[in-house]
């Protein structure tokens, strides 16, 4: 820990990393406060900030020679086999760490690698290479299984803890496994933080973008007050401000053979309204809709739009164009709606629900990986980050209000490299509720733009359903509306 006065150059360097976001740190009294320029307080500067050689400092950081927390179950023959790009990452990490050791810098590195790169297996290789006792911290238990599989493949002694940290501490008094796989809420326990700071050298923060370290969270406090000897942040979409806690980044681009297509399933609807819809419309401009809660609630009860989504999915699935589908909503009730409707059509052998309230969901996710055809309905919160079903070939985005980081993570669910190359995403920019028509169009255009400009998708117009079924809800009400629709689409390509 280093308590320092906030001199101008230090403040400028830290503030630059926040990209306009308020800079917040722990002060000498232990309060987590916004840092003002010229402040007379001393602040706790995160250890990982000094990982970059561009940060000038006279501070000297302890090295691995001061600890003896070595893995005992290591077997070099169990090291995973890596692809060339993954080996390149390992080479970059080892080279950077040698330089850090020579210059007595903290061994903190962010691995900024694309969705589907294989961050888990690459990090397990690094873990085995370092030979140091390791804590793997995940944001939710959905991610436990993929880590368990890779750690077991390396042959490392490990312990998984997702519930009570108190019972874990009791077990650690008699045994200290080489690898601990825990959920981040364990870091709310100071005794546990002290224990891993003393007995474990390597800390791996998986999906680091899910933590806003400019907030006073358990992870923020852990990194500030109990900084590990070595640390990896793993993410495909790094938060700029989090770099303050891990100020060295390795990013290696991945070329892909995947054929990625995004369809905008557009349609004009007759205006649709109910008493419930009219009630929610009144709240659109109020403070209760600050995070677009009512915008998403309106989408969840937009029956013509919901029917369009169902019609499109059913037609594509029955035709065999797509086979392993992820359906994503923002709200739980919207998820349940689609699940029930699809369950009636295809049955429980095909349709599954990713419900955060069901403790059996992780086991169910594990089981459907072996299926050739399935429909998995879930929420953005539960499955938008870290869902490990590599065989997914299609994604239906039923919600609209999604930030750029969430969009990239969500699209990454269908960008895992497999022998099958076709990947398809469906978005639905139309709504029958006129009060949110342009808002939904703008949000959907952001999803399309990011997928095309950053992730290599090709945008195509989806006309099959509208043309094949003139009686469906997506039929336009007049020839003039069809013309306007084409004009609108051409302007937004």
From Swiss-Prot:
Its EC number is 3.6.4.-. SUPFAM superfamilies: P-loop containing nucleoside triphosphate hydrolases (SSF52540). It is found in: Virion. A motif (DESH box) lies at residues 206-209. It holds the Pfam family ResIII. Gene3D superfamilies: P-loop containing nucleotide triphosphate hydrolases. Keywords: ATP-binding, DNA-binding, Helicase, Hydrolase, Late protein, Nucleotide-binding, Phosphoprotein, Transcription, Transcription regulation, Transcription termination, Virion. Residues 309-456 form the Helicase C-terminal domain. SMART domains: DEXDc. The keyword Transcription regulation applies. One of its GO terms (molecular function) is helicase activity. It comes from the Viruses. PANTHER family: ATP-DEPENDENT HELICASE IRC3-RELATED, TYPE I RESTRICTION ENZYME ECOKI R PROTEIN. Interacts with OPG087. Might be part of a transcription complex composed at least of OPG087, OPG110, and OPG145. Belongs to the helicase family. Poxviruses subfamily. DNA helicase which seems to act as a postreplicative transcription termination factor. Involved in ATP-dependent release of nascent RNA. Forms a stable complex with single-stranded DNA, and to a lesser extent RNA. This is Transcript termination protein OPG145. It comes from Vaccinia virus (strain Copenhagen) (VACV). The lineage of its organism: Viruses, Varidnaviria, Bamfordvirae, Nucleocytoviricota, Pokkesviricetes.
């Amino acid at each position: 820990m280093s308590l320092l006065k906030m001199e101008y150059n230090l403040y400028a360097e830290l503030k630059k990393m926040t990209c306009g976001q308020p800079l917040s740190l722990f002060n000498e009294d232990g309060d987590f406060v916004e840092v003002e320029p010229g402040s007379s307080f001393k602040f706790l500067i995160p250890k990982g900030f000094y990982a970059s050689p561009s940060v000038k400092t006279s501070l000297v950081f302890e090295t691995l020679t001061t600890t003896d927390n070595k893995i005992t179950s290591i077997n070099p023959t169990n090291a995973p086999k890596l692809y060339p790009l993954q080996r390149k990452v390992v080479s970059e990490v080892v080279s950077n760490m040698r330089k850090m050791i020579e210059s007595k810098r903290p061994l903190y590195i962010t691995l900024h690698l694309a969705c589907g790169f294989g961050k888990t297996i690459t990090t397990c290789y690094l873990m085995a290479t370092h030979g140091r006792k390791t804590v793997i911290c995940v944001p939710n238990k959905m991610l436990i299984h993929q880590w368990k599989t890779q750690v077991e493949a390396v042959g490392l002694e490990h312990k998984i803890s997702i519930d009570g940290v108190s019972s874990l501490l009791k077990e650690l008094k008699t045994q200290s496994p080489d690898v601990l796989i825990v959920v981040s809420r364990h870091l709310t326990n100071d005794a546990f933080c002290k224990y891993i700071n003393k007995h474990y050298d390597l800390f791996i923060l998986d999906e680091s973008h899910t933590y806003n370290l400019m907030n006073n969270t358990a992870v923020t406090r852990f990194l500030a007050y109990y900084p590990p000897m070595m640390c990896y942040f793993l993410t495909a979409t790094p938060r700029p401000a989090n770099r303050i806690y891990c100020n060295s980044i390795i990013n290696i681009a991945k070329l892909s053979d995947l054929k990625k297509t995004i369809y905008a399933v557009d349609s004009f609807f007759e205006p649709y309204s109910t008493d419930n819809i009219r009630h929610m419309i009144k709240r659109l401009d109020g403070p209760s809709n600050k995070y677009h809660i009512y915008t998403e609630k309106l989408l969840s009860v937009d029956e013509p739009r919901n029917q369009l989504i169902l019609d499109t999915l059913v037609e594509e699935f029955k035709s065999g164009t797509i086979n392993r589908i992820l359906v994503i909503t923002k709200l739980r009730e919207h998820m349940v709606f689609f699940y029930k409707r699809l369950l009636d059509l295809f049955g429980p052998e095909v349709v599954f629900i990713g419900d955060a309230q069901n403790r059996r969901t992780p086991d169910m996710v594990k089981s459907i990986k072996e299926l050739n055809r399935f429909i998995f309905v879930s929420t953005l919160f539960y499955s938008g980050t870290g869902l490990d079903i590599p065989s997914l070939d299609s994604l239906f985005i039923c919600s609209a209000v999604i930030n750029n980081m969430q969009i990239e993570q969500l699209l990454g669910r269908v960008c895992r490299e497999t022998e099958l190359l076709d990947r398809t995403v469906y978005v639905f920019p139309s709504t029958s509720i006129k009060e949110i028509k342009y808002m939904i169009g703008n949000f959907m255009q952001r999803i399309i733009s990011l997928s095309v400009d950053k992730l290599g998708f090709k945008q195509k117009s989806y006309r099959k359903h509208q043309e094949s079924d003139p009686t469906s809800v997506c039929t336009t009400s007049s020839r003039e509306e069809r013309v306007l629709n084409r004009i609108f689409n051409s302007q937004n390509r």
